Amino acid sequence: MKRRLSLALVATLLAGCGQQAAPTAAPGTGALPADAAAVAAERGLTADDVYAAVSTYQPSGHMDDYILFSSGGQAGQVFVIGVPSMRILRTIAVFAPEPWQGYGFGDETTEVLRGGDMPDGTELNWGDTHHPNLSETNGEYDGEFLFINDKANARLAVIDLRDFETKQIIKNPNSLSDHGGSFVTPNTEYVVEGPQYATPIGWEYAPVEEYNDKYRDLITFWKFDRVAGRVDEGQSFQIELPPYWQDLCDAGKSVSDGWMFCNSINTELATGGVEDGNPMFGCSVIVNP
């Protein structure tokens, strides 16, 4: 089908490039109408360009086949994008106030935002969102909830997909940064917040010379109450890891159900001082054998 359409488009485009009047396409032939062919020729579009355009175009009143949840990075929110149109359908406010949609400026949303403040009461009004993830049933996406992490401040947010609004933000009590996102176990019993950089546990200070002894990573398993649509902090737990740097963590499925997988970098425990003989950070080393 694509090949037949492409051939018809090529013929039409060639006619347009030759400045010849193209006849109106007959219904069902796959050829472009004359006015559309003229636009394509004027812009120098190839048959593949035109095919890509018509593959993604969605007229008003037509729904996309899929929706994509994209992290907003240091803007601290989540974008909802239609696929294949790639239109932004909604911006979900999460870790930062957004005056234009009233988030963080009323009692209800302010309470949600303040739930993610620092343990000492310092307000956090920004975030760095990474790796959103959907809730699952039997290892398949069920579209009920979306979870998103704040890499900069080690926080987790719960978004209810009945109304596409943030319902809960939690500050990790022991971690300073995360990256492993907010992946879930096969039936969303737990939301898994993976760590990134090792730090002293409990907000204590330790010099880098004590890195191996005092610095640790933590994988946090947040217990999720699906009925309440909230994380139950009292039933959650953490696993202590060596002070490697973790990237992404996710739960196994099917034959690997019951296992958790997390990839690591900087297993050399590099902290600088290469010129003094300390380990080099292997991720950036190029070896010439």
Please report, for each region that a protein language model flagged, where it lies by residue:
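Short coil/turn segments that connect the beta-strands within blades of beta-propeller domains
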Residues: 64-66, 143-145, 187-189, 256-258
